[in-house]
Amino acid sequence: MVQPYKHEPFTDFTVEANKKAFEEGLKTVQAYLGQDYPLVIGGERVMTEDKIVSINPANKTEVVGRVAKANKDLAEKAMQTADAAFKWWSKTKPEMRADILFRAAAIVRRRKHEFSALLVKEAGKPWKEADADTAEAIDFMEYYARQMLKLKDGIPVESRPGETNRFFYIPLGVGVVISPWNFPFAIMAGTTVAALVTGNTVLLKPASATPVVAYKFVEVLEEAGLPAGVLNYIPGSGAEVGDYLVDHPRTRFISFTGSRDVGIRIYERAAKVHPGQIWLKRVIAEMGGKDTIVVDKEADLELAAQSIVASAFGFSGQKCSACSRVVALEDVYDQVLNRVVELTKQLKVGNPEEQSTFMGPVIDQSAYNKIMEYIEIGKQEGKLMTGGEGDDSKGFFIQPTVFADLDPKARIMQEEIFGPVVAFTKAKDFDHALEIANNTEYGLTGAVISNNRFNLEKAREEFHVGNLYFNRGCTGAIVGYHPFGGFNMSGTDSKAGGPDYLLLHMQAKTVSEMF
């Protein structure tokens, strides 16, 4: 019997043995930095002349790996391989597919610190953030395997006398998984295994900033018994390979995590029916947020300040769930703002390989430039309280930045920055605070810090986000505990790590027999 699901515990790095184990993980990764990695198509390793170079964002001169780069011809080969594999993979027993996930989770668990150390190097994640990313990858495998076992026999429906009706789920076809760089293990693994365990075949196009961890995960799935051709690893340009696969008539669904603009582009392209296409493509998209923490006048203000700082600056604000806006009632505004500034000044920014670092670099030059531009906009729109400096001489480092006294419609209150920047605005009362909280085109996460039960219940009904948290920060959703996904321009309302997520990768079939 399968044990009930429990989320993977986070590592306590105050325990010396855990600290040493993580340091060993860093040594393991250091030893294989700079290697070349192939595409994987039908189990075959394919090297290309053209490469994607993955660098350490904390040290631009350090190459994490050089990864083969797919073009249209190789993408077509991968599509044909996945399409052929679907014919038999879709007929495999759900129990077999679930067992592959259970085994893959066990392999990653044994190599946990190595994977986390790779995230430190490739994504610039500090220890705790990297450890949480790896734990979440394990959680997705454990949770989705169990969910598939629950769904494998379908759902009972009514039958009339002399009639038997069965309602069950079948796979869709070939899925294109386009994964992000900010959770390059967790989200990449979760979106991939959700498609695989439901009986689909996959073309995996990981983010160009973090392709090495995706290759290492493909190796894990192979070791766990995933047959050749079921998962094909094809990093490449979004404009060339991404568009080609989104448009392809044999693509059945696209699972995308990334920016609003790219998500909209994929959604538009996927809607077009191409010659030879015999279905309407399904799009599963998670597209970002502009997330607000509301601080009520009846609130634990220290809890509010701690929650804001952790949610705004964890992983340098590079989470779609990050707090980038604070709406505080005018009665407590100055107190909360001043305490947040105090706490922000205490944060250690630097090399994520050092355990004491709270905040590492941002992902690349393009992100650095964009965030610094938004900081300049913020200086025009509001009052800079702390931070605002950047240094891209060695890596892409930006100081945690707090702006005050913003108009709720200011650009840095409306547009996703995806960096260590948080903006404060005042509300007259709680209704006004909720009105501001709902005034963006997004609807992903939010939090309310309040001791007023009436106001919390009001927020439960009126704060229009997919993940709403009371008296805590707005980041850190745990698989199976906080199904994750938002409204409006935050995506297609899907809930990763929730009980209905796998259904997005299947279609329901009814069979009725008369006797």
Curated annotation (Swiss-Prot):
Entries under InterPro entries matching the protein: Ald_DH/histidinol_DH (IPR016161), Ald_DH_C (IPR016163), Ald_DH_CS_CYS (IPR016160), Ald_DH_CS_GLU (IPR029510), Ald_DH_N (IPR016162), Aldehyde_DH_dom (IPR015590), Proline_metab_enzyme (IPR050485), RocA (IPR005932)
Keywords assigned by UniProt, alphabetized: NAD, Oxidoreductase
GO BP, sorted A to Z: glutamate biosynthetic process; proline catabolic process to glutamate
Catalysed reaction equations from the record: L-glutamate 5-semialdehyde + NAD(+) + H2O = L-glutamate + NADH + 2 H(+)
First-tier enzyme category under EC: oxidoreductase
Active site location: 286, 320
Cellular component, GO annotation: cytoplasmic side of plasma membrane
Pfam families associated with the record: Aldedh (PF00171)
GO molecular function terms noted in the UniProt entry: 1-pyrroline-5-carboxylate dehydrogenase activity
Pathway the protein takes part in: Amino-acid degradation; L-proline degradation into L-glutamate; L-glutamate from L-proline: step 2/2
Annotated EC: 1.2.1.88
PROSITE patterns: ALDEHYDE_DEHYDR_CYS, ALDEHYDE_DEHYDR_GLU
This protein's record includes keyword Protein transport: no
Family indicated by similarity: Belongs to the aldehyde dehydrogenase family. RocA subfamily.
Protein name: 1-pyrroline-5-carboxylate dehydrogenase
Annotated source species: Anoxybacillus flavithermus (strain DSM 21510 / WK1)
